[in-house]
């Protein structure tokens, strides 16, 4: 990291013009490798995340030598024809270069972010990076709104548009040419920006960080004008969050847009005045909610479609944006089924000798666990069948008993940790039951005995260790309600340390 800082200090005024030489620096690939290790999931192996023990400085040096010999443009072609290189998978070179790309391409944005906060007091916003931080916002805002726009974020007609947008931020022509070559090589860019991306292991495992950066940059471009319009029409102060990559240097983008679009949009801002408009994005979708009328939502819908198609050349269709009444739908996002439903209550009011009973209905946000998709994920991972019946895990029978229990325990704790905000815990208990019995059947299969006899011989306490830990943590956090396990099971808990959805929860 010190070498990278010294390189950038050589010419701070032109750091954007000298990104290409960084591809020949070994420490860049070491940084990418370290990033992959720190972002791994506790119960997923490094091989699943494609940051395994096969990484070595020798492979990096061989790669750099081949690039010095002007062969970097044919590395991917040759590498795709060879099944392995020194015992590695056939996509090793392309994976390593894309990881280096991901580190280098973030440098200009990181430098602007640091410079924008020089001399300013930066507030700690680490909690904003948590996925669960979205739900308290929904609990506070959504219950007062009427309509919602479900938007499937459009993607560029051609990936050349992404390169053209990056030219405004990166001036290195050689680096951009090589970037263009990468995008031509991975021509199925569209599959990454849709929900089918989950089936494409190339993007998810081998080039995760590189394409995630490009996707965030693409979304940032599509959102920039919308946020600018909202600020101009509502006269509200916008704040940037350093926890999200696409929010980087938002103020600088606004200053640029003020000059370009001041005259064009001044006459139409009055069409969209709505002080109760809220917007948030998750995965490949976004949601706009409002307290306004359906007519106002239709204006936003067709305005966004025309803006994306005419200005950004994004492929979009009106049927990709759905207008719904908030009280009549379930929002399926971030692994939860969320809905706003009236919560009736009876209030007894007594004035002198007269008593009145008043029925009050207050909207409440309900967050449910989607049982069918989650059981489908468990069935895909071979923990149960499609009907939800627990089955053994034959692939794990070669491990020690303690390792098997530990792996099941970590999965169970991760699921409980993520779905601790559910309004109804019965579905979560069913998932725990599936994992508990699957663990017992795996151990019984290993020892060639039945589940009943195995549990009778060893007792059921050996399985309770990883199933009770979550309740112990909640009792420590909320000591006032720890005495009542029934009340504890009804409490919704949102954690601020969840920064990603793992494969089991990516619904």
UniProtKB/Swiss-Prot annotation:
Main location: plastid
Record's subcellular location: Plastid, Chloroplast
Source superkingdom: Eukaryota
A biological process term (GO) from this entry: mRNA processing
One GO molecular-function entry: RNA binding
A Pfam family the protein falls into: Intron_maturas2
Alphabetically ordered keywords of this record: Chloroplast, mRNA processing, Plastid, RNA-binding, tRNA processing
Gene Ontology CC, one term: chloroplast
Family in the record: Belongs to the intron maturase 2 family. MatK subfamily.
Function in brief: Usually encoded in the trnK tRNA gene intron. Probably assists in splicing its own and other chloroplast group II introns.
UniProt xrefs under PANTHER family: MATURASE K
Protein name: Maturase K
């Amino acid at each position: 990291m010190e070498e990278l800082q010294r390189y950038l200090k050589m010419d701070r005024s032109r750091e954007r013009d000298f990104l290409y030489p960084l591809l020949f620096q070994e420490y860049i690939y070491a940084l990418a490798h370290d990033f992959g290790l720190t972002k791994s999931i506790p119960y997923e192996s490094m091989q699943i995340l494609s940051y395994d023990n096969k990484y070595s400085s020798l492979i990096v040096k061989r790669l750099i030598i081949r690039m010095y010999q002007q062969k970097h443009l044919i590395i991917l072609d040759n590498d795709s024809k060879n099944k392995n290189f020194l015992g590695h998978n056939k996509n090793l070179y392309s994976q390593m270069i894309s990881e280096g790309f991901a580190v280098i391409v973030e440098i200009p944005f990181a430098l602007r972010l640091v410079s924008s906060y020089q001399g300013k007091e930066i507030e700690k916003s680490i909690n904003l990076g948590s996925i669960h931080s979205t739900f308290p916002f929904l609990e506070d805002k959504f219950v007062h709104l009427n309509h919602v726009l479900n938007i499937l974020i459009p993607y560029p007609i051609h990936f050349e548009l992404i390169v053209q947008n990056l030219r405004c931020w990166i001036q290195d022509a050689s680096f951009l040419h090589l970037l263009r070559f990468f995008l031509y090589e991975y021509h199925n860019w569209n599959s990454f920006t849709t929900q089918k991306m989950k089936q494409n292991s190339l993007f998810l495992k081998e080039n995760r960080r590189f394409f995630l950066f490009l996707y965030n940059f693409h979304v940032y471009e599509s959102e920039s004008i919308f946020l600018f319009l909202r600020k101009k029409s509502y006269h509200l102060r916008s704040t940037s969050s350093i926890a999200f990559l696409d929010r980087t240097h938002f103020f600088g983008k606004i200053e640029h847009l003020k000059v370009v679009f001041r005259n064009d949009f001044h006459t139409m801002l009055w069409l969209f005045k709505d002080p109760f408009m809220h917007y948030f994005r998750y995965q490949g979708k976004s949601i706009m909610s409002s307290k306004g009328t359906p007519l106002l939502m239709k204006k936003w819908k067709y305005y966004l479609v025309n803006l994306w198609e005419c200005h950004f050349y994004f492929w979009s269709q009106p049927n990709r944006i759905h207008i719904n009444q908030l009280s009549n739908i379930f929002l399926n996002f971030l692994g939860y089924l969320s809905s706003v439903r009236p919560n009736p209550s009876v209030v007894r009011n007594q004035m002198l000798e007269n008593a009145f009973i008043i029925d009050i209905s207050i909207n409440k946000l309900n967050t449910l666990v989607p049982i069918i998709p989650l059981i489908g994920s468990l069935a895909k991972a071979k923990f149960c069948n499609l009907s939800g019946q627990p089955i053994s895990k034959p692939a794990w029978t070669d491990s020690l008993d303690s390792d098997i229990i530990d792996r099941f325990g970590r999965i169970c704790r991760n699921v409980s940790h993520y779905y601790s905000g559910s309004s109804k815990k019965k579905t979560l208990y069913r998932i725990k039951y599936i994992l508990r019995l699957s663990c017992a059947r795996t151990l019984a299969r290993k020892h060639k005995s039945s589940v009943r006899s195995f549990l009778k011989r060893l007792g059921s306490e050996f399985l309770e260790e990883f199933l009770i830990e979550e309740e112990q943590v909640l009792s420590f956090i909320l000591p006032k309600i720890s005495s009542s396990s029934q009340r504890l099971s009804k409490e919704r808990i949102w954690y601020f340390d969840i920064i990603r959805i793992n494969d089991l929860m990516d619904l």
